[in-house]
Amino acid sequence: MSVKSLYHNNNGRPSRGEVWWVKLDPSKNHQTVKTRPCLVISVDQVNSGAANIVIVIPIEFENQGIASHVRVDPREVDLKATGFIQCEDIRMVPLDRVQSCAGVLPVGKMVEVEENVSLLLGLG
């Protein structure tokens, strides 16, 4: 079974917990730019809604040593190298910037991201 056939259970749109390549330009200040893998964190009702947006967190390939970043092994998702989910860099992007699916984040990693985001936003 191919990697691609495991995904797209949301009518071809990104689903929560999936990693997609997203065109992040334009960006402001210190935000990640270019086309990068991103974790989809918005719920599927938003992802398939009329607003045509998704909420994502970029994944960088450089370890900056920031405690809130979650490490992703390239064997867990189809990445070229070890990635680091930047939990402090939450973005809304239009669906037309979302390009291709790289896989589904393991449940344990998704829980770690949710915990870090909750701490950063004072929700938990």
What are these regions (language model features)?
Residues 1-124:
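Conserved functional hotspots at enzyme active or ligand-binding sites that engage polyanionic ligands
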